[in-house]
Amino acid sequence: QIRDIMEANPEKIRNSQSSIVRDLIERAVRVKAEVVSEDLRESGRREILNYGHTLGHAIERAERYQWRHGAAVAVGMVYAAELALAAGYLDETIVDRTRAILKSLNLPVGYRGDRWKELLETMRRDKKARGSLLRFIVLEELGKPRVYEVPDDSILYMTYQEIAE
């Protein structure tokens, strides 16, 4: 599994020329191609590929696209994990594991606390939003994504405090 390889080899993954990085990219592309081929119109399963992207895209915009996409999505992944924990979908050990893996790869796991209102406004314009409900891809367990329509902005804000710096 991709996550296990990342967890076991952070020093090799930090070297973009390593064979492990090539292997991970090939694995990720195969997974993405499989998901896309099952849902060409992004009306169902393909939505899982947006894991970490709702907040990640808002961070990219807030930073005027000066952040790398992967760094912004990494923060979004931690936020999605924290949302899943708050909703009772995910165990705290998986949230901690997610943070640890991303940190070991020198990726950010938090973002500025003073940008919340701007991020929320941007997320409301996200293609995945449905009316006043923001939709996030979260995990119920490793390898088992689901859509979470967050019922209340207070949940979003309280969860953001878990990643705010």
What are these regions (language model features)?
Residues 1-49:
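Carboxylate- and glycine-rich phosphate/diphosphate-binding segment that chelates Mg2+/Mn2+
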Residues 58-67:
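Catalytic Zn2+-binding segment of zinc metalloproteases
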Residues 2, 89-165:
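C-terminal charged capping/lid subdomain of soluble metabolic enzymes
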Residues 24-32, 77, 102, 123:
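Short alpha-helical scaffolding segments that buttress acidic/His motifs in well-ordered protein cores
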Residues 51, 55-59:
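Active-site His/Glu-centered metal-binding helix of metallohydrolases
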Residues 53, 77, 142:
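Residue-level signal for inorganic ion chemistry
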Residues 45-51, 67-73:
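Short glycine/threonine-rich catalytic loop with a Thr-x-Gly-x-Asp
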Residues 70-85, 97:
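An active-site-proximal "capping" alpha-helix that borders the catalytic cofactor pocket
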